[in-house]
C-alpha cells in the first residue's frame, strides 16, 4: 500500500537528486550557482571532490527539494563512478557550444550513464555558453537538437552568465521527474524519493554532516 509523502520538517514533499555531467570547463558549476543562488562568477577555483547545492521549488502544489550535485573537477580524471550516480533521478548533460570536443564527448558521458545510473533516470541535453558571439560558436543549435532527438531527450541552450534558460532547464527536468513519480506504483518508493516520517531523523543527521561542504 502506498504511503503518502510527509513533509520532513514541514518544508518539502519530495527530494529529487539531480546531477550535472559533462567535460571540465563547460560551465556546470556556473549553471549550478546561477540556479541555486542566482549569482554568476568567472573566477572559480576547481576543487577535487563532489559538491551540491539545494533549492526548493513548487510544482503542482507540491514542494520539491532539488539536491543538485556537481562533480567539482572529478570529470578531469574520469573518476565518476556508480557512487556518484546512486539515487539520481535526473541528469543534465552539459557541453560548451564553443567547444566541439565537449559536444562530441556527450556520447561518452551517455555511455557512462548507461553503465552506472538507473535505467529510468531522466536526462536532458544542455548547450551552455549560448551568450557567446556567433563567430565563436562551434556547435550549431540544430546539431545539439539532432543529438537530443537521437537520444529521445529534451534540449536547451543556456547561458549562466545572462541567465538564459537556466530556470527553464532545471524546472523542465524536475517536472518530468515528478510526473514520472506520480505514474509509478509503490515499487518506486524504496528509491528514497518520497520522504516519510521515519526518514526525518536521518535527514536531519545527514544535513548536519553536509553542512561542512563548501562550494567553489
From Swiss-Prot:
**Record PROSITE patterns:** RAB
Residues where lipid is bound covalently (S-geranylgeranyl cysteine): 212-213
**UniProt keywords, alphabetically:** Cell membrane, Golgi apparatus, GTP-binding, Lipoprotein, Membrane, Nucleotide-binding, Prenylation, Protein transport, Transport
**Where is the short sequence motif Effector region located?**
44-52
UniProt source species: Arabidopsis thaliana
Presence of keyword Cell cycle: no
Q: What are the GO BP annotations of this UniProt entry?
A: protein transport
> What ranges does the record give for the region Disordered, renumbered to this chain?
196-216
Query: Where does it reside?
Result: Golgi apparatus membrane; Cell membrane
- Subunit structure as annotated in this protein's UniProt entry: Interacts with PI5K2.
- Tell me what this protein is called: Ras-related protein RABE1d
Q: Which GO terms describe its molecular function?
A: GTP binding; GTPase activity
In terms of InterPro entries, this protein maps to: P-loop_NTPase (IPR027417), Small_GTP-bd (IPR005225), Small_GTPase (IPR001806), Small_GTPase_Rab (IPR050305)
Amino acid at each position: 500500500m502506498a504511503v503518502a509523502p510527509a513533509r520532513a520538517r514541514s518544508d518539502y514533499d519530495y527530494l529529487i537528486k539531480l546531477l550535472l555531467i559533462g567535460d571540465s570547463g563547460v560551465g556546470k558549476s556556473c549553471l549550478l550557482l546561477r540556479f541555486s543562488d542566482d549569482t554568476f562568477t568567472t573566477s572559480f577555483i576547481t576543487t577535487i571532490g563532489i559538491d551540491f547545492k539545494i533549492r526548493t521549488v513548487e510544482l503542482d502544489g507540491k514542494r520539491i527539494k532539488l539536491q543538485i550535485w556537481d562533480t567539482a573537477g572529478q570529470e578531469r580524471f574520469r573518476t565518476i563512478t556508480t557512487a556518484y550516480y546512486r539515487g539520481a533521478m535526473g541528469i543534465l548533460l552539459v557541453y560548451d557550444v564553443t567547444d566541439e570536443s565537449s559536444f562530441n564527448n556527450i556520447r561518452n558521458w551517455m555511455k557512462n550513464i548507461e553503465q552506472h545510473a538507473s535505467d529510468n533516470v531522466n536526462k536532458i541535453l544542455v548547450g551552455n555558453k549560448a551568450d557567446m558571439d556567433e563567430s565563436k560558436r562551434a556547435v550549431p543549435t540544430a546539431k545539439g537538437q539532432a543529438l537530443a532527438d537521437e537520444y529521445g531527450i529534451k534540449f536547451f541552450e543556456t547561458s549562466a552568465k545572462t541567465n538564459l534558460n537556466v530556470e527553464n532547464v532545471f524546472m523542465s527536468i524536475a517536472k518530468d521527474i515528478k510526473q514520472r513519480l506520480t505514474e509509478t506504483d509503490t515499487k518506486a518508493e524504496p528509491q528514497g524519493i518520497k520522504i516519510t516520517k521515519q526518514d526525518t531523523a536521518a535527514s536531519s543527521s545527514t544535513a548536519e554532516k553536509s553542512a561542512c561542504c563548501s562550494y567553489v
